[in-house]
Amino acid sequence: MQVFREKQLLIQAIQKVKSDGKSIGLVPTMGALHEGHLSLVTNALKDSDQVIVSIFVNPTQFDNPEDLEKYPRNLNKDIELLEKETSDIWVFSPTANELYGDKILSQNFDFEGLESVMEGEFRAGHFNGVGTVVKHLFEVITPDKAFFGEKDFQQLQIIRKLIEKTGLPVEIVGCPILREDSGLARSSRNERLSFQNRKEAAFIYEVLQNANRLFGTESAEHTTNWVENQFKNNQHLKLEYFEIADSETLKKVNKKEKGKQYRAFIAAYSDGIRLIDNIALNN
């Protein structure tokens, strides 16, 4: 498996692949890889001649320095996990200065309001940081396709908007959420949960499934109130937000409209660890 730390060496290798008429698939990650990431890699391998996995803990998307410091990092373990899939993958793991240059700054984007709701409401500047690093990665790697998980659905829509705004020739592929047997969405943060916390956190997906059923016959307001009450009665999890939104615009739904696609989004804390999830709603 080839591991690139310098972007110039990677660019040269990519030019060789592209000159042979082969396609590049990118799976951008912040490391701490798990089965969810591997499912993205599997999708990329089916759809691309050469797959590149970027492993980079991006400082510009953290609004909380403590969160950045605590984010799990183990490059050797990540590489071992990828090698079990295939040794044909390339890994790009630069330092912040290698990727950004001397000034590690976040760029401001106009995401037309997609960035100001839900996650954006609670994490100031987060999506500008995401947009900045993804734009840098796309410019260095020039992928034909990039693969993102639907667990971060808001991020997925923002990346699609980034492509629309910048005109970068990258096809964005959304991949289904991978879940643990309990239903808990796979996440790097799950590593920080105790065995008991992990069991208790399965409640999040259970509530989402019930909200989906309820939304089939009830209003968005009624469904939201029901979810909030479920968390008021739960001693182990603290709800940060639950929102039903239009799948495309991410605008909060007040009244259901026929033919529209909706999604429920949730963020909750388990013993101080923030977990997010979402589900497509039947209308």
UniProtKB/Swiss-Prot annotation:
GO cellular component: cytosol
Protein localization: Cytoplasm
Catalyzed reaction equations: (R)-pantoate + beta-alanine + ATP = (R)-pantothenate + AMP + diphosphate + H(+)
EC number: 6.3.2.1
Annotated beta-alanine binding sites: Q61
Pfam families: Pantoate_ligase
UniProt keyword Amino-acid biosynthesis, yes or no: no
Top-rank lineage group of the source organism: Bacteria
Keyword vocabulary terms for this entry: ATP-binding, Cytoplasm, Ligase, Nucleotide-binding, Pantothenate biosynthesis
Record keyword ATP-binding present: yes
Purpose: Catalyzes the condensation of pantoate with beta-alanine in an ATP-dependent reaction via a pantoyl-adenylate intermediate.
Description of how the protein assembles with itself and partners: Homodimer.
Name this protein carries in UniProt: Pantothenate synthetase
Origin species: Christiangramia forsetii (strain DSM 17595 / CGMCC 1.15422 / KT0803) (Gramella forsetii)
Gene that this polypeptide is encoded by: panC
